[in-house]
A protein has these predicted regions:
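P-loop/Walker-type NTP enzyme "switch/lid" segment
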Residues: 39-121, 222-225, 230
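Conserved catalytic-core segment of NTP-binding enzymes
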Residues: 27, 114-213, 222
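Walker A/P-loop NTP-binding active-site region of P-loop NTPases
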Residues: 2-68, 127-128
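C-terminal lobe/tail of nucleotide-utilizing enzymes
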Residues: 174-282
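Flexible glycine-/small-residue-rich
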Residues: 7, 36, 87-90, 133, ...
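Charged, alpha-helix-enriched surfaces in structured cytosolic catalytic cores
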Residues: 39, 51-54, 65, 108, ...
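Conserved beta-strand scaffold positions in the cores of enzyme catalytic domains, especially
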Residues: 2, 83-85, 210-213
């Protein structure tokens, strides 16, 4: 399954969520691949060290093959699980190069990403491939959406973010007909008990599952880019990541064994039933 993490704007916690969810599934015995497609503001390299000569940029530029950009970041704690990571080049030169790419190049990249998807799922093969896409509606993020089986849209409670996310889903996502899940991050503690987060948000006739509602936490902010499932097993944020993993499997997954394994990890107080977000047709 290809899962793309996307957001209307930066600063929503999209990257932190993608790398922690990827690590969690690997810890549970899954074969997982995490790819940094935020080519204009890469950040996964701050957590994972590139053990290869090449970057994702090089594959997209037809410099190397797929396996040349994948670094094995598996740990002993993952057992039979596997975590391979493809990192975007963080150098200023590489970022400026990505900024200068034209539409023709981006269209060619879509073909490269589709080949990437086919190869990873059929030849490696992976249970999950996570794309950490650029925020907003630029060609590179649209490519990541088109290649996905499921798109997880991360939003905060900021009004401009919510309205932008709503508009983005209505005007763009429906064109691609992708499965979509919503993660609401950085929710003020005093708002967690409100009906809007516990039940549903009426925005129209279409229903989208809210697979995670994550409270704002100073601990998460000060921890930086931390792999919570490895370093902070009992942290509330870790429990929320497990809840998101459960909901992802419940809604779109195919294996009951994974769900049961997650259930054993999740606190009995956590709600495993996904909520619903509605958005307008027009």
């Amino acid at each position: 399954m290809i899962v793309t993490f996307h957001s209307y704007k930066g600063g929503t916690g999209k990257t932190l969520l993608s790398m922690n969810l990827a690590t969690l599934f690997a810890t549970m015995g899954k074969r997982v691949c995490l790819i940094d497609l935020d080519l204009r503001a890469p950040s996964l390299h701050l957590i994972f060290k590139n053990g290869k000569e090449y970057w994702v940029n090089d594959y997209l530029n037809k410099v190397c093959n797929i396996e040349s950009v994948l670094t094995d970041c598996s740990t002993e704690g993952m057992g039979k699980g596997k975590l391979l990571v493809g990192l975007a080049n963080p150098s200023t030169e590489a970022i400026l190069e990505m900024e200068s790419k034209n539409r023709t190049w981006e269209m060619e990249v879509l073909g490269r990403l589709l080949s990437f998807k086919t190869y990873l799922l059929n030849n490696m093969p992976f249970d999950y491939v996570f794309f950490d896409a650029s925020p907003g509606l630029i060609y590179s993020s649209i490519n990541a959406i088109v290649c996905a089986d499921v798109v997880l849209v991360v939003t905060s409670t900021d009004k401009s973010d919510v309205e932008g996310t709503r508009r983005m889903i209505r005007e763009c996502y429906e064109l691609f007909d992708r499965k979509i899940g919503i993660i609401i991050n950085k929710v003020p503690t005093e708002s967690l008990s409100l009906k809007i987060y516990n039940n549903s948000i009426q925005l129209g006739t279409h229903q989208l599952p809210i697979i995670g509602v994550i409270p704002c936490s100073c601990d998460v902010a000060t921890a930086g880019r931390c792999l919570f499932d490895c370093e902070k097993l009992n942290h509330p944020f870790t429990e929320k990541i497990r809840e998101i993993a459960t909901n992802l499997e419940l809604i779109w997954g195919t294996t009951d064994n994974t769900i049961m394994t997650i259930h054993n990890l999740v606190s009995s107080e956590s709600s495993l039933r996904p909520n619903l977000l509605h958005h307008p047709v027009s």
